[in-house]
Structure formats: structure tokens, C-alpha cells
Swiss-Prot record:
Subcellular location: Cell membrane; Secreted, Cell wall
Record-given protein name: 3-O-alpha-D-galactosyl-alpha-L-arabinofuranosidase
Functional note: Hydrolase involved in the degradation of the gum arabic arabinogalactan protein (AGP). Catalyzes the release of 3-O-alpha-D-galactopyranosyl-L-arabinose (alpha-D-Galp-(1->3)-L-Ara) from gum arabic AGP. Can also release 3-O-beta-L-arabinopyranosyl-L-arabinose (beta-L-Arap-(1->3)-L-Ara) from gum arabic AGP and larch AGP, but the alpha-D-Galp-(1->3)-L-Ara release activity is 594-fold higher than the beta-L-Arap-(1->3)-L-Ara release activity. Exhibits no reactivity toward p-nitrophenyl (pNP)-alpha-Araf or any other tested pNP substrate.
Active site positions: E194, E321
Species of the source: Bifidobacterium longum subsp. longum
Chain ranges of the CBM6 domain: 521-656, 669-779
Length: 1136
């Protein structure tokens, strides 16, 4: 079921490949649309799987300063997003206080990164560089000491030495990098950034200007210096601290780096550098404005024509900055850029509008996803595929439907990523989109296919986006001449969609709707009922303005001052618990909004602080606040959000179903094998053994990136097929959690209770061939949270500069926290009044901060037993160093854990906008039972972090969750019924009035719930009580069955013959035999074993496994294309 705005409305039904209308399973006929928008004409995206366009390039996942420090972002976030390329500053560069190439390189390359670009001019502290003027020869740099000597690269002013100053800078930064990097061959060096703008060589596109001629000369000189230093390390003349030598023929160099496409200047550079043998390896320019969505392809084609004209081998291209503030975090916007760049096979990096370390606003909080992150995750999943031709009805246009499509022949999977469907309102609400696919090869997909469509809604740059929901399903659809149409209604232009086609599977994918506890509804804040001063504001759709964030629905609610209210009259689809989410932004500080349901107070939304350091961000940089509403009943309810003195502005509200309210799991999400990221030999299997669509681990790995709203325990249920004794390993966020051993042959499940981090968790399954995974399901298990060991920071043993700080305006628990861990920055209140936290770190002109190093603060806790833990730190960080024209100069802070003198863990902790606002960040730690001391022992300049000032974040609390709780819980493989007098062939007898005691044994031993339910096939012949005691009633034969409560498909039984007192007992087995009988799942006896013991190749696994597509396939001859009838995301507009 898709999101509904305000109420569920049956909508358009999808069209099958044969163009026949088919009905969603279990849903009635569609009714008339409730609003005019829902009668919007269908928009079509044409995907030709018969025309491949090359190997998937993956370059559109690039970032400029996407990484802030090692661990910022986290591994799960970084690996999930599969960032292919990022540009960072040089070692010890001063342009920004974080994002040092040497600090981030190992984490980047360990998590799917392929290429690091270094902006060499970012050595300078000022923007524009050197005051915007080309340097001359006024300095002498110290170059005659080791590159890691503190004096190396320092300079003396007013000391000309007959050498261009920037040439010396290039030598300094190249030596600092090559003396320390572990990945020289994967680094690209860019000597100039925006030379056409404010950085030294501005001439517009006039390639004849004297200043541009100077640029051509300087390009050749810079090229020569970079190659000189490279060759010194390659030859061994100079050495690297890690013993790593460059192996490539030459250093990779990128340029020119212009701020826009400059045709004349670019052609002149190609001509000049070809003649001088200094051609760039990577051609670089920016595509920042929304006009690039229509003009980029012409720029690309013109550039390629220059290469052809000049006889130059095609160069790689990196669009080193793309997009506007309004594009970041918005799936329906980002996909438009991705489609252009992937189709032309170039790298492209999102622009750096705000701060480093959050993937350019494409993640949320410390470790959570926003809508942008999920799109990057989907895009990263396409590695190893081939792209195919995609044609939009709106080619080369701004803000319209676009997509990327690929075919994975090894895994027999076709994927389409799309979004951006728009109309004259510039909102694009409720537009039906048909993905028209042709060329689907029957040799790959067979005669019939399954389709899944997932929806990824916009939640703001810092608003949490949960796992995208399945909103459209097609099962066992016959292909007609390789053609298939799938129609899904798009919620709005901001949303993104993932469509996956596979051969028909034995893994059924269900719609995420009220029936399985996964419904979702949404409403624009401005469409709620406003009262007591709250006001709706109409906003621009942001076209043509790079400096504005996106406003969902082109509006929001402000003037939300004390007592103001917005009320959502919502039709709840089913009884249960629901999570209300408010997409909102205060002015830089945290606070609360009160929440009422039908006039009754139900608690507060804890609204987090958000970025407010500049006009473009204040009240516009939206995050999210959540509260669970327990016990909502089906039907209409009024949910009211009431303002306090926080004065936050709000964009939209969402209502997520948490559970069905009938004891079903909380926050349950299923990830089928076809949605997993397979690597190192793991592959989707289609061999006809009842495991079609399962992931055969095959010695490789299958990764799931699972969302959790909060830190704590989750049940991870793995459904799989394997031979008895086969095993595989479950790891969570890089930590081994459990080795799972198959307890029987065939289909089964195992459950591991694991401590999750708040946000994204990387679950990895690794095992041998023959272990075939159908799905992984996660569900909250909060009852185990009591196993965690929690410390309030102020209760720890403090020393040095550590001190307890009380702040009633903070969102720290108890309004107290510990500050002063590690070194301490010297700060003052110098920020602009009214724009968030005014605290600034004192720093010199080079952004070097003043640090107190003589009183390192620590906090020590005891009582944590030896073991592996997910350590959750609730922290704050308001460190802000220096100034910049548009980038907040924030930094990550480091926290380390020591046991005795041994460091056992460390982490980077992001900027939280103010010391008053606390976030959660997890660090994996293994202890030996001793006292644990937390602080920061890094020495200034140690390069253990991008900014190694030895300063730690403020700490509110620390919670240690053991990685797992309990042993692996396996599924029931069989039920055996036995008892005195039961024969080997499962028969027993007794007389009327007599009793017989039966026992039921549930296997394997690792089953958690071994209770059974006893039943009699005819209680007029014999009854059985809850303890298995059978009593004869009258003569006859009856079957007594014990059914597993944990798995009702598993049972065992015996046949009991009841005789009158005068009758002779029938022969059939020795009464002293005490034989046992294992019943089949259908209750049959006769000495046959249950299906779980029949072996993986018995052919019966599909019949009895609960995760097959049998139920859907049984709808004879009907292909179900779920594209409507209340199952799609609807937006009910209340204004024109």
C-alpha cells in the first residue's frame, strides 16, 4: 500500500503486458478519483532491454567533500551509498577544517570507493584562493626536511626565491600526500578549481585573453611538478611511510575545473596540452544550475567533438560539482541528474553547499538514511550490470520524469530507477507512470516474471527515511514478445521509485500495507487544519534558484508559536500502533511540540536542532521528529501538533504503521533475496528446485542494509534452504554475530537477536554453496533492551578537564551532560545572533584553532563484563572553526575508549548544530572486563583524524548492548508423537473409558517455543487434553495430532483405535515397543518423515515453505499487477 494523503483512495489499476486490466489481489474494483489530480494523464518511461548502452559506470554517485573524517559518515552509510568518487582537500590543507584526503582514504576504499580526487588549491585557507589573485614569487617554502616534519611546507613572506609560489605549494602537497598515502594509484590530482571564476584566471570564455594564456603556461608547469614528485616516489628516490610505491605510468591529473562549461577555453586547453604532452587524464567542469538538466548533453557532445576534431583519445570526464540545494536529498530530483550522467558514462559529484561528512545532505543524523541515500543505495546496487536505453517523454528538460535502467544477466534481474514525474503545478501529485519495457529476453527471464516496485518519499535533508515500501507487485506475469507495462501512481515529483523484474520466484513479495503492518500515509503541513496563529506559506518551486532548499508541495507552515496548532484528520486503516513523523526545522536549537489524538495528550515530539547558520538554511534545513502513537483504532482520528516556544517551521507529516495491534512483530520489514547486494560469487538461483529467486551464497556474501528507528535489539529472521549441517555466518556492521547451522534439510528459518545501531545497519550473510537465502526479516525486540548496561555520563568517574554541565534547554537526559573530554577548544560567543548556536572556536587566519592541551579530560566506567558490544554514545558537538562564504566550517570530534593503556575503540562524532542537541552514534567495542576510560588522546597534527585536535564531543550517556542476546532460534523441523503403547508404525489402542498419555517432541532443540496444540479428528471417538492425555469415548478409529504452536505447518500424529470392553484389541505392534512417529506437516502418518527430513531435492520444499509464491500462483491465469485500488501513494490536495 502506498502513502495516502489524508485518506486511502482506490486509484488506477495497472495495465498488464497484454493491455488487459487486471485487479489487485483482494482489492475491489477501482472507483472514481477523489481529486482532479488523480485523473492526471499517464506518463510513460520507455525502457528498451534489447539495446544495451554499455557497462554500468556508477560515476553519478560522486561527492565533493562528501566525507568529513574517518568514520564520518559511518561504514554502513558509506558502503550502502557506494560512493564511487569523492573530492577532498590535500593533506594539511587549510580551506576547510576537515575532510583531509589522508584521513578518509582507507575508509573510502574499504567501502566501495574507486577514486579520490584532491583539490590541490584547497591548501590555501581563503576563498577565493590567495585573495582571488594569482600568486607571484613572494614566499620561500621550507622543502629541505621530511614531509612529515612540522616545519615542512612552512614559508617566509617577502622572500622571493625565483620560483612561482604555487609551484612550491604543489610540491608541498604532493609530497605530503605521496609520503603517507596507502592508495597512490587511486588518487587523481586537480591543480586548479574554478580558474574561470574568482580563482586567478577569470576571462569568461575568452580563450584569447592574456590571463587565459597565462593559465595555459601555468597548466604545463603544474603538470610537470606533479609528475616530478610522482616519479620520485615511483623510482624509490623518496619513500612512503607505509612502504607503498606508485605503480601507474604517471600521476592522474584532472582539469581544467571550470565553474561552468567553457567551450572555447576547454578547446584551447586541449590544443595546448596536446602539443606540450600535458593532456589532462580527466576533463572537469561544473554543471550547477537547473539549466544543466536541459543543456548538459549538448556540452558533453561538444566536448567529445573537440576530441574527435583534435585526434585526442577520449578522456574520462568528471562533472566535479552538480546540482542545487533543492536537489540534495530529493530522490525525484537526483534521478534526473543521474540519468544524464550514467547515459554518458561520466563521473559526477554533488555540490558541497553545506558541511563535510554527510554525503552533501544525502544522509540524515549520525547514521540514518534520507530519501537521497536510498536512491544512492539503489544506484550502487547496479554495479556489475549493463545499462540499457531509456527514453523519456521529456528529454533534456528541467524537472521531469527520467530514469536509469540496467540488466543483470548473471542474476537474471532487470532494474529501473525513476522519478520526477511533474505537471503544471510543479508538484506532480498522483501522476500514474507507466514503465514500458521491451526486449525482455525469454532466455533470461523465462515465460513469466515477477515485478516489485518500491517507493522512496522525500523527507528533507536531515529527516529520516525508513526502508522504502513495496507499493506494487506483479506475480507470474506472462511476457508477450518481451514486452511488459507496469503502471504505478507517483506520489509527487520529489519521490523516487525502484522497479525490479525477475523470473517468477519461489519467494513471494507482499505489498507493504495495513494487512502486514506497513501502511504509510502523508499530508503536507499546509493542508492540515491550522489554528491559533499557525499560518500556511506558499513557496516557489525553486526553479532557477540554486540557493533554496526544496519545499514539498511548494509550501509549509510557519508562525508556529506558543499554542499554534495544526490538525490532521486522518483515516487510520487498521487497529495498531503508528509512528507520527513531522518534517520540520527550528532555528538551530532543540525543543518539543505537543501531540494530541482526538483531543487527548499523548506526549511530545522531541524536535531536533537543525542547521541555521545562514539565511539559506534557517528554518529551511528540515529534519524529522517522531513519536509512537499506541492503540490507534481503525477509522477517523484527529492528530494535533501544538507549538511551544520553539518556533519551528514544518513541511509535511507522515504516519507509519508500526504493528497491526494483534501481537504481531513491531516495525517488521522483509528484505527478499532479489533486494540484497550480492558479492564475491553469491548469485540468485533459478534451478527449479523450489528455490527460484533465492540467493545462493556460493562462498560469497549477501548484504542487507536495514533501517532501525532506534538503537536496541532486533530479531533477524533468515529464511533459507540448506542441507542439514550446512552453516553460514551473520555479521552486523562488521561484527560477527552468529554462526547459523541448518538443523534439517530443506526450507527453514533461524532467528538471531542482534543489537542494532540507530539508522542503517549492514547485515552480511556469508557461507558456502548450497546455502540459499530466501529473505531476511527484521523486527524490533525491545524486551531485550534491559540486557544493555547504561551509564549517565555525569555518574562516571571524571578527571582532568571533564566536568558536568547543566543545561535546561538541552535535550540531554536529566538536562546534564559531560563536557571537556580530551583537549578543550578555546571558544567565544561570536556567531551571528538569531542564527543558531553562536559558539565559535578561536582560530587564526589559517583556521588553526586555539586548543588547551594541558588538562585532558576523561570519564571512566566500570562493570562492563568481557564481551563484544554495540556501544551507543549520546553526544553533542558544536565545534565551528573559521569562516567561509557558504560552507559552515564545522568539524567532527574524536572519542576513544581505552581499557588500561590499550585503545579498544574509536569513533568520529559529527556536528550536531549546538551543544544542546544530542544524537546517537554507535561504536563496536570488545572488552575484557576491566574499567573503560573515554576521552581523546590524539596529539595535535597526528593525522589520526582530519582535524586531530584531540578534542572529544560532549557525552550525555553511554549504553553497552551485547552484540547478541541468546542463542540462534531455529524453525521447527518436525514434531514426533510417542507414548507407552504406541507402535513403530504410529498406532495405539485403548478401551472406552481408558486413557493414554502421549508425548510430543519438537525438533530441533534450538526451537524457542516447543509447545504444541493437541487435537482429535473425532471427539465422539476419543478426546485429548492440553497435556496429550487421550480418553476413549466410543468404539472407532481416530487420529490424535500434535501441532507446533511456533509453526502450524509442522505436526505429528498417531492413529488410535478405541474398543468396547468386550472387544479384542487389534494386533499391530508390540506394546513394549514404545515406537515413535514423526508426522508430516499435513498430519499424515504411515512411517513417513516430515518434509524437513526429505532432503533439499525432494521437490516438496516449495509446497511447505511459507515464503513461496504458491499462494499468488494459485490465482489461475490471472497476473496481478498491483498499481492501485488504494495501494499506491496518494496526495489529496485541499487547495487548488
Amino acid at each position: 500500500m502506498g502513502i495516502s494523503r489524508n485518506r486511502l483512495v482506490p486509484g488506477l489499476v495497472g495495465l498488464a503486458a497484454s493491455a488487459a486490466i487486471v485487479l489487485p489481489l483482494g482489492i475491489g474494483m477501482p472507483v472514481s478519483s477523489a481529486t482532479a489530480e488523480e485523473n492526471a494523464p499517464v506518463q510513460t518511461l520507455n525502457v528498451d532491454y534489447g539495446t544495451t548502452t554499455g557497462d554500468f559506470y556508477g560515476g553519478s554517485s560522486g561527492m565533493l567533500y562528501g566525507l568529513g573524517d574517518e568514520g564520518s559518515p559511518t561504514d554502513a552509510i558509506l558502503d550502502g551509498a557506494r560512493v564511487q568518487v569523492t573530492s577532498q582537500k590535500p593533506a594539511d590543507g587549510l580551506q576547510h577544517p576537515s575532510a583531509d584526503v589522508l584521513a578518509v582514504e582507507n575508509q573510502f576504499f574499504n567501502n566501495g570507493g574507486e577514486e579520490l580526487v584532491v583539490n590541490l588549491q584547497d591548501w590555501y585557507p581563503d576563498w577565493s584562493y590567495n585573495g582571488g589573485k594569482r600568486p607571484g614569487d613572494t614566499r620561500s617554502y621550507k622543502l629541505d626536511v621530511d614531509p612529515n616534519d612540522a616545519q615542512y611546507g612552512t614559508y617566509t613572506d617577502n622572500a622571493p626565491n625565483d620560483r612561482w609560489d604555487f609551484d612550491e605549494v604543489l610540491e608541498v602537497v604532493m609530497n605530503k600526500i605521496l609520503a603517507n598515502t596507502s592508495h597512490p594509484d587511486n588518487i587523481v590530482f586537480m591543480p586548479f578549481n574554478e580558474p574561470d571564476g574568482g580563482n586567478w584566471y577569470a576571462s569568461g570564455d575568452n580563450a584569447s585573453a592574456d590571463i587565459y594564456k597565462q593559465f595555459l603556461t601555468d597548466w604545463n608547469d603544474a603538470y610537470a611538478t606533479i609528475q616530478k614528485v610522482w616519479n620520485q616516489y615511483k623510482s624509490g628516490e623518496k619513500t612512503n611511510v607505509n612502504g607503498v610505491k606508485p605503480t601507474a605510468d604517471h600521476a592522474l591529473i584532472a582539469g581544467p575545473g571550470d565553474s561552468v562549461w567553457r567551450a572555447n577555453r576547454t578547446k584551447a586547453l586541449l590544443e595546448s596540452s596536446k602539443a606540450a604532452n600535458t593532456l589532462p587524464d580527466v576533463i572537469v567542469w561544473h554543471e550547477l544550475g537547473n539549466g544543466s538538466l536541459k543543456n548538459y548533453r549538448s556540452h558533453y557532445n561538444q566536448y567529445r567533438s573537440f576530441e574527435q576534431e583534435l585526434g585526442i583519445t577520449p578522456r574520462a570526464i568528471n562533472i566535479s560539482e552538480f546540482g542545487e540545494l533543492r536537489d540534495m536529498s530529493v530522490p525525484g530530483q537526483l534521478i534526473q541528474w543521474m540519468s544524464m550522467f550514467e547515459s554518458t558514462k561520466v563521473q559526477a559529484q554533488t555540490a558541497y553547499w553545506n558541511y563535510a561528512g554527510n554525503l552533501n545532505d544525502n544522509m540524515a543524523r549520525a547514521n540514518s538514511a534520507n530519501g537521497g541515500w536510498w536512491l544512492y543505495k539503489w544506484y550502487g546496487d547496479l554495479r556489475g550490470t549493463q545499462t540499457v536505453k531509456v527514453t523519456s517523454e521529456h528529454p533534456d528538460s528541467v524537472d521531469n520524469l527520467q530514469g536509469v535502467a540496467a540488466i543483470d544477466t548473471k542474476n537474471r534481474k532487470a532494474t529501473v530507477l525513476y522519478g520526477g514525474a511533474n505537471d503544471a503545478t510543479k508538484i506532480g501529485a498522483n501522476i500514474p507512470v507507466t514503465v514500458h519495457m521491451t526486449g525482455l529476453d525469454q532466455s533470461v527471464f523465462g515465460e513469466s516474471v515477477d515485478v516489485q516496485v518500491r517507493e522512496n518519499a522525500y523527507t528533507g535533508p536531515d529527516g529520516v527515511a525508513a526502508t522504502p515500501r513495496v507499493v506494487n507487485v506483479l506475480s507470474d506475469q506472462k511476457l508477450v514478445n518481451g514486452t511488459l507495462d507496469v503502471t504505478t501512481t507517483s506520489i509527487d515529483r520529489y519521490a523516487g521509485y525502484q522497479l525490479v523484474v525477475t523470473p517468477h520466484q519461489d519467494v513471494a513479495t507482499s505489498l507493504d500495507n495495513a494487512e502486514n503492518g506497513r501502511s504509510l500515509q502523508a499530508i503536507e503541513a499546509e493542508d492540515t487544519t491550522l489554528s491559533d496563529g499557525a499560518k500556511a506559506y506558499t513557496k516557489s518551486d525553486n526553479t532557477g534558484s540554486w540557493g533554496n532548499f526544496m519545499f514539498s508541495g511548494n509550501g509549509d507552515v510557519g508562525n508556529f508559536k506558543n499554542g499554534a496548532k495544526m490538525t490532521w484528520n486522518v483515516d487510520v486503516p487498521a487497529d495498531g500502533a503508528y509512528r507520527l513523523q513531522l518534517i520540520t526545522a527550528p532555528a538551530g536549537f532543540p525543543g518539543v511540540n505537543h501531540v494530541y489524538v482526538d483531543g487527548k495528550s499523548v506526549g511530545d515530539l522531541n524536535v531536533p536542532a537543525e542547521l541555521a547558520l545562514k539565511e539559506a538554511a534557517k528554518w529551511k534545513y528540515r529534519g524529522s521528529a517522531e513519536i509512537v502513537l499506541d492503540g490507534l483504532t481503525k477509522g477517523k482520528h484527529a492528530i494535533t501538533v501544538e507549538a511551544t516556544d520553539l518556533d519551528n517551521e514544518s513541511d509535511k507529516l507522515l504516519l507509519y504503521q508500526v504493528s497491526r495491534g494483534d501481537g504481531t512483530p513491531v516495525d517488521q520489514v522483509t528484505y527478499p533475496a532479489s533486494d540484497m547486494r550480492l558479492d564475491s560469487g553469491a548469485v540468485l538461483a533459478y534451478d527449479g528446485n523450489g528455490t527460484n529467486g533465492f540467493a545462493n551464497l556460493n562462498g560469497g556474501r549477501a548484504d542487507v542494509f536495514a533501517h532501525a528507528w532506534e538503537a536496541g535489539y532486533q530479531n533477524v529472521t533468515i529464511a533459507y534452504n540448506a542441507a542439514k549441517g550446512a552453516h553460514f555466518v551473520l555479521s552486523v556492521n562488521g561484527q560477527s554475530a552468529a554462526t547459523v547451522t541448518a538443523q534439517s534439510d530443506g526450507a527453514q528459518t533461524s532467528i538471531v537477536r542482534v543489537a542494532f545501531s540507530e539508522g542503517i545497519n549492514q547485515l552480511t550473510l556469508s557461507g558456502a554453496a548450497g546455502v540459499r537465502v530466501a529473505s531476511v526479516t527484521t523486527a524490533r525486540a525491545s524486551e531485550s533492551d534491559s540486557k544493555a548496561i547504561r551509564f549517565e555520563a555525569e555518574d562516571a568517574q571524571l578527571s582532568g578537564g571533564a566536568k558536568v554541565q547543566k543545561d535546561d534547554a538541552s535535550d540531554a537526559s536529566g538536562k546534564s551532560f559531560v563536557a571537556g573530554l580530551g583537549n578543550q577548544f578555546v571558544t567565544n560567543e561570536s556567531g551571528k545572533a538569531g542564527y543558531g548556536d553562536q559558539t565559535r572556536v578561536e582560530a587564526d587566519a589559517n583556521h588553526v584553532p586555539t586548543v588547551a592541551q594541558n588538562n585532558k579530560g576523561t570519564m571512566t566506567v566500570t562493570g562492563v563484563p568481557a564481551g563484544a558490544y554495540n556501544m551507543v554514545v549520546r553526544f553533542s558537538n558544536d565545534a565551528f572553526i573559521g569562516s567561509h562564504s557558504y560552507n559552515p566550517q564545522v568539524v567532527d570530534l574524536g572519542l576513544q575508549v581505552r581499557e588500561g593503556d590499550q585503545e579498544i575503540a574509536r569513533g568520529s562524532f559529527r556536528y550536531t548544530y549546538t551543544e544542546k542537541h544530542f544524537m546517537n552514534r554507535s561504536v563496536t567495542v570488545t572488552t575484557h572486563g576491566g574499567a573503560l576510560t573515554l576521552g581523546n588522546w590524539d596529539e595535535v597534527g597526528s593525522r589520526k583524524a582530519a582535524v586531530s585536535w584531540g578534542v572529544a564531543p560532549n557525552v550525555d550517556s553511554i549504553t553497552f548492548y551485547p552484540i547478541t542476546d541468546g542463542n540462534v532460534i531455529d524453525s521447527v523441523s518436525g514434531v514426533t508423537v510417542s507414548g507407552e503403547g504406541v507402535s513403530a508404525d504410529g498406532k495405539a489402542s485403548l478401551k472406552v473409558g481408558e486413557t493414554l498419555s502421549l508425548n510430543a517432541s519438537v525438533t530441533p532443540d534450538s526451537v524457542a517455543d516447543k509447545t504444541v496444540q493437541w487435537t482429535s479428528s473425532d471427539e465422539q471417538v476419543a478426546t485429548v487434553d492440553e497435556h496429550g492425555v487421550v480418553k476413549g469415548v466410543k468404539a472407532g478409529t481416530v487420529t490424535i495430532t500434535a501441532t507446533s504452536v511456533a509453526d502450524s505447518s509442522r505436526s505429528g500424529s498417531v492413529e488410535v483405535t478405541v474398543a468396547e470392553d468386550s472387544e479384542q484389541k487389534p494386533s499391530g505392534g508390540d506394546g513394549d515397543n514404545n515406537g515413535e512417529q514423526t508426522g508430516k506437516p499435513d498430519g499424515n502418518t504411515g512411517g513417513q518423515t516430515s518434509d524437513s527430513d526429505a532432503g533439499a531435492d525432494s521437490g516438496n520444499n516449495q509446497k511447505h515453505m511459507p515464503l513461496t509464491g504458491a499462494a499468488v500462483a494459485a490465482v489461475a491465469g490471472v497476473a496481478v499487477l498491483l498499481a492501485g485500488a488504494g495501494l499506491l501513494l496518494k496526495r489529496l490536495r485541499s487547495r487548488s
